[in-house]
Amino acid sequence: MECRSLDLTIISAEDLKDVQLIGKQDLYAVVSINGDARTKQKTKVDKDCGTKPKWKHQMKLTVDDAAARDNRLTLVFEIVADRPIAGDKPVGEVSVPVKELLDQNKGDEEKTVTYAVRLPNGKAKGSLKFSFKFGEKYTYGSSSGPHAPVPSAMDHKTMDQPVTAYPPGHGAPSAYPAPPAGPSSGYPPQGHDDKHDGVYGYPQQAGYPAGTGGYPPPGAYPQQGGYPGYPPQQQGGYPGYPPQGPYGYPQQGYPPQGPYGYPQQQAHGKPQKPKKHGKAGAGMGLGLGLGAGLLGGLLVGEAVSDIADMGDMGDMGDMGGFDF
């Protein structure tokens, strides 16, 4: 397959549509062959350019010479407004057949051309200026080529690439074999003795009957033996704590605890009488409160009586019964 390199310089644009409501718009251009995303290249963003961006951005593409001469390749220029907050918005587009450019090729000379910019509705608004130059033909894949071409840019046809796929429910094969079945650690299974080919474990302590778990059943602790290091219980004096029963039953030797707020029952002796200082304190407080209330009432009553007396004395003065 014979290919050519295509050198482009996106120079500038003029009289474009202004899609920015406030301030000047920022514009950039995207170049591709037939709009294929795999061939897209982008210019820098010209800040605050308004309707007259200037880029002077260089880029290189590779085209299939036979497809270009058969007019199957189109060079597409998309002018876009850069808007980080509201989202980028298309301003215009230019489509140029590669064959048209190839027919204007004159050796190593770079040619500058200007094309009309089309709005999304098809109307012309503004112009785009760029320069181009084609390289010499070379065979794709040959070491004598000027550079390694971009396969996706050589033709508008989709070049199928081998894709590794796996059926649903199966992942990619692993480079390591699956681990053997059985315990994941290097220890033998619990309860197995390699030497005697039997069951092994911790020796059961004296006084504990054999059980399914590693702990003796409740209430099976010996009263006189115990663990090493602890002396046996004394026979005289106060009795020690009785052995605990199963979980959920009251402890032996002690009465069950009553609800919260009630006095607890004593195990020995007569029940203690509640102290009287609480009632005495309550009675004293009640008496003080009543006394204070009575005293306040008396004071108020006396004040009212004094005011009434002063009013009566004023009336007597009006009678004029005395002369001075």
From Swiss-Prot:
Coiled coil: none annotated. InterPro entries: C2_dom, C2_domain_sf, C2_SRC2/BAP. Pfam families: C2 (PF00168). Residues 1-111 form the C2 domain. Residues 141-281 are annotated as: Disordered. One of its GO terms (biological process) is cellular response to hypoxia. GO terms for cellular component: endoplasmic reticulum; endoplasmic reticulum membrane; extracellular region; plasma membrane; protein storage vacuole; protein storage vacuole membrane. Residues 1-279 are cytoplasmic. The chain crosses the membrane at residues 280-300. Residues 270-279 have a biased composition (Basic residues). Residues 166-175, 246-269 have a biased composition (Low complexity). The keyword Endoplasmic reticulum applies. Keywords: Cell membrane, Endoplasmic reticulum, Membrane, Signal-anchor, Stress response, Transmembrane, Transmembrane helix, Vacuole. Induction: By cold stress in roots. The keyword Ribosomal protein does not apply. Its main location: endoplasmic reticulum. SUPFAM superfamilies: C2 domain (Calcium/lipid-binding domain, CaLB). It is found in: Endoplasmic reticulum membrane; Protein storage vacuole membrane; Cell membrane. Residues 301-324 are lumenal. It is a single-pass type II membrane protein. May act as an activator of the calcium-dependent activation of RBOHF that mediates reactive oxygen species (ROS) production and may play a role in cold responses. Interacts with RBOHF (via N-terminus). This is Protein SRC2 homolog. It comes from Arabidopsis thaliana. The lineage of its organism: Eukaryota, Viridiplantae, Streptophyta, Embryophyta, Tracheophyta. The gene is SRC2.
